C-alpha cells in the first residue's frame, strides 16, 4: 500500500494505490483505499483491510450522527475526525493494525492529519504512509513543495505513487486521486496504462 496526502494552495489532495495483498499474493487489484466521510473530508487507509475499513465505516456513521444531533449547517472539522480515529486506535492498538491520513476542507481551510498506529494524530502539510512510502521518501523530499496548486499536486502525487508501485510488491493497480476544495470534491482513477512511468512490468 502507498497512501499520500498534501495541503495545496486551493485545497487538499489525497492519493493511493489500489492493490490489496494476502502475504505475497495479490488478493484485490482495484481496492478503494480512500473513503469519503463527508463530501469535503476523506480518509486514506493502510494496514489491515478489515481494521481500516471498519474504522472508516465507524467514522462515517459517527460524523453523520453528529451532523443530525447538532441540528446545524456547520461543517464537521477535519480535526474532530482525526481525533475520533486517534482515540479508537489508542484504545485498541493491540487489536487494530492501521495507519490513516485524514484530509479535507473545513471552516479553518485545508487540513491534513496523519493518524498513527499508536494513537497519535499529527497535523501535516504533507504525509505519506504504507509499505510503498519508504521507496519514495527521497523523491518526495526533493519534489514536494508547499503552496502547490491542486493540479500541480495531482501531477506530483501521481508520479510519486507510480514510483512506489514499481518498487513495492505490495502496491500497484490503478492510482486513486481525490481533489478536495472548499466548493467540491472530485475522484479520479488512473489506470496503469495511463500512468506516467509506462513500464510494461507494472501494467498487469
Question: Model-derived features: where do they sit?
Answer:
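Long, low-complexity N-terminal extensions
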Residues: 1-204
Amino acid at each position: 500500500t502507498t497512501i499520500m496526502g498534501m495541503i495545496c494552495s486551493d485545497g487538499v489532495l489525497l492519493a493511493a494505490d489500489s492493490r490489496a495483498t494476502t502475504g505475497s499474493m495479490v488478493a484485490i487489484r482495484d481496492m478503494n483505499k480512500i473513503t469519503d466521510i463527508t463530501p469535503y473530508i476523506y480518509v486514506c487507509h493502510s494496514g489491515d483491510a478489515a481494521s481500516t475499513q471498519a474504522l472508516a465505516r465507524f467514522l462515517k456513521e459517527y460524523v453523520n450522527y453528529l451532523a443530525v444531533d447538532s441540528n446545524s449547517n456547520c461543517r464537521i472539522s477535519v480535526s474532530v475526525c482525526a481525533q475520533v480515529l486517534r482515540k479508537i486506535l489508542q484504545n485498541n492498538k493491540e487489536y487494530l493494525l492501521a495507519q490513516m491520513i485524514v484530509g479535507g476542507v473545513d471552516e479553518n481551510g485545508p487540513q491534513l492529519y496523519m493518524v498513527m498506529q499508536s494513537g497519535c494524530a499529527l497535523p501535516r502539510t504533507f504525509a505519506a504512509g504504507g509499505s510503498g512510502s519508504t521507496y519514495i521518501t527521497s523523491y518526495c523530499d526533493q519534489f514536494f513543495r508547499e503552496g502547490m496548486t491542486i493540479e500541480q499536486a495531482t501531477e506530483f502525487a501521481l508520479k510519486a505513487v507510480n514510483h512506489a508501485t514499481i518498487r513495492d510488491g505490495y502496491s500497484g493497480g490503478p492510482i486513486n486521486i481525490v481533489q478536495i476544495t472548499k466548493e467540491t470534491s472530485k475522484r479520479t482513477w488512473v489506470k496503469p496504462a495511463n500512468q506516467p512511468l509506462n513500464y510494461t512490468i507494472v501494467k498487469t
